[in-house]
Amino acid sequence: ITGQVNSALVGSDVFQEADITGAAESFVKYSYLVRKAGDIPRILREAFYIAASGRPGPVLVDVPMDVQLAEVKKFVWPEEVNLRTYKPTYKGNTAQLKKLMKALAASRRPILCTGGGVHLCQGAGVVRAFAEKYNIPVISTMMGIGTMPTQHPLYMGMLGNNGGMAANRAVVDADLVIMAGARLADRALSNPTELFKGKTLVHIDVDPAEIGKNAPVSIP
């Protein structure tokens, strides 16, 4: 939550005015400039919802001075949030899941890599059950550490520049790589485009913008 000059002066470049919503646009999920004090309950409810849902991230609420001084006669916290332009996806695509299972059945050297997204969706138990059922070795990014117990016989350690030889070698040797809740960032994979040549890459992430961003994906 940030402070702003009086609403009537926004955009006139007065003393201490800053276009904070514009400046923060590249690193927040959403920005609000509060125009009326009566909108504060709705905006705060929406801001918390956007920040915590889907892929979590910061939401900026900019409050002009006159709005800060105004009185909200009846503060009513909205029961529901209805945002037409923000609909995070949680359910998997059945057709794509079938492709994943078909690729897994044909694979001889599969590997499952878990990222921080598995923790955020509290999916560690599902990952563990899936790996055990199909006997798939598991590695993790730094943010994914803990999705599998470190002493589990299927766990091969952390991937990346700060990871172990076994985990990094497992990706090189695999013919099927399942990335769950990981961004494929440079700290985990230095050259993903080259690394995944000749492999089937499955990328699972709640944020569609991350899928295929850093490497060509076979099954999104």
Predicted features by range, described:
Residues 1-220:
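N-terminal alpha/beta PP-like core and its mobile active-site loop of ThDP/TPP-dependent enzymes
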